[in-house]
């Protein structure tokens, strides 16, 4: 069973949100998108530690700056789906038989709705119900008992940097039998791994597993509320770097086909660690939903990679939040969700499964995920043909007082990956875009591609396309008053009887296209803003306008 959809109306900082989820998702967005409100909602409503949550007055949304305009109604709908048609009949879910609803796609789902009503006297009422696929309440007896069973089967564990963990005041001393169980599980996993063909000694395996325990109980532990003296792994490895390397090898061993038993042991180890460190007790049938909050806050990128690989081995649904380009480079783009606060809602943008063809997906994975993962945080992409344009455009924008990084604008060259996949991807992810093309034959084809994507809408074309009235960037800048730079680099006198193309070719041979572009951009900087071609100034204003439209 997985949590398939979260719908929130009027809860804390979220006016309206509809979020589809898969087995693993990474959520990104700017600071005000409502991350804390979403994670709080899941943590409070599906917590294994607390009894059923009752809404309070502070849970109701109000318009920013207008606390008197606080809403009096909120509702949250959590949709759970069986992983395969027919799975709802297995023993684990039998107690929830009355809550399942058949759907047209042959899957059964549980629609769990919570409503909050705030009275004029400040009193708050919390209502719970299970719905059918048409949104009508099901005649379920003992709704609260059913909800408790649902939470027992799929509790939320919120894992975050141990520095920010919430201290549990009572029951911080771990139960000794649990500590012994953990030691036995570690020993068994070490013996299991030692029987497999690999190049680690028994001691190295144990050192790697020690790093695993250290990671699970320290770096990703909110439930780990015990004091330092109660930690299971008291002594840190003398050579921590080597331990992480061994853990990386162990991860890869467990990730191989036929290693399901090792994953089960790993899950048991993870569960026992959590229970040994606090008052938390998980049901034997529980398959927790992990909320991993900004895992990069305390991990070096290499360690982050190893830690993320370890979490990938746990057979559990996971929702992570991050501000790290490093983590995004480790995540398939179809698992990334961009959340953007708009005036009336928080919009969730995603590629989703099957969002791109296999070839386009491969191009995006290489061009964006592996080489420019941080561009997924951008508000607007300015797509240019190559490296020359990247150098010139960034520098000229700076001369005009536009700081692209601060505005959330990323200049991305598209010649290597193709224009169409990038535009399609940007649209699916809610990233604004603008294309700059040359005036040569290739540029005209790119312009035609943009127009076809915009259905030849003239107004849209004005917002999304700028075409150079010249063969390429070099010819354009030559005509815009920078001929002397080309002559200087080509080591030619100003009035030499030679056509423009030959002068530019000679200048490129004397340096290179990127170096020539930098020379032109630096000269523009010396001359001031008036030297920046009006075409570019107009384009910069449009791109900044697009970016700000998304940010507001």
Please give the residue ranges for each predicted region.
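Conserved P-loop NTP-binding catalytic core
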Residues: 40-106
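Activity-critical C-terminal alpha-helical subdomain
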Residues: 445-519
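Flexible phosphate/Mg2+-sensing switch loops adjacent to catalytic phosphate-binding sites
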Residues: 47-72, 140-143, 275-285, 322, ...
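Charge-patterned, long linear interaction tracts outside catalytic cores
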Residues: 238-244, 393, 398, 487-552
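Electropositive, glycine-dotted interaction segments
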Residues: 85, 89-188
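RecA-like P-loop NTPase motor core
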Residues: 328-329, 334-442
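Extended helical coiled-coil dimerization/tether regions that scaffold
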Residues: 165, 174-288
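Switch/communication elements of ASCE P-loop NTPase nucleotide-binding domains
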Residues: 1-27, 32-47, 245-371, 448, ...
